[in-house]
Amino acid sequence: GIECVAKRAEISTHALQGLYGELDRERLSDDLLRGVAFEAADATQYSSLDYSHLYMFDRVFSHCTLAALAKVLQRSSFYVMISSRKPQVWWDVGLHKVQPVAKMRFKTTGREGCTAFIYINKDFIPPGSEQRVPE
């Protein structure tokens, strides 16, 4: 994952290391978390974000940041994206490849209530399986 604040990337890496200690090694593969890593960087500067799943705590992102990130995401090959932003916000800043499929409430570590919107990348919807509106 990409974190814009170096200290948060460090905290995330330590949390990941802690997860390894909690895994039941006899029941789960050692490779379970092998694809998880964190780095401190500016995601808006990437050409694309080619992760399978994206989670963004984007409540604090400015319109300018969202627009820059939308350009990167529009070129990206993710399957699932989780964001605190409503679909219309993403569509308005140019991210048209996302289709909302669910939303859920959660609490942050600071006990603040939030809504997460779950999107899929329309590039990976099989042809002919789009939902049709009855006429």
Regions of interest found by a model, annotated:
Residues E22-R27, D50-H53, S84-W90:
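A generic short-segment signal for beta-strand/edge and adjacent turn/coil regions
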Residues R34, D50-S52, S77-V80:
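A short pocket-lining beta-strand/turn micro-motif at the edge of beta-sheets
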Residues F61-P134:
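C-terminal substrate-binding/active-site "lid" region of AdoMet-derived donor-dependent transferases
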Residues G1-I2:
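Conserved SAM-binding loop
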Residues T44, L49-L66:
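A short SAM/SAH-binding and catalytic strip from SAM-dependent methyltransferases
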Residues S12, S29-R34, Y55-V60, W90-H96:
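Short linear motifs at secondary-structure transitions and domain/linker junctions
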Residues V5-L49:
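S-adenosyl-L-methionine
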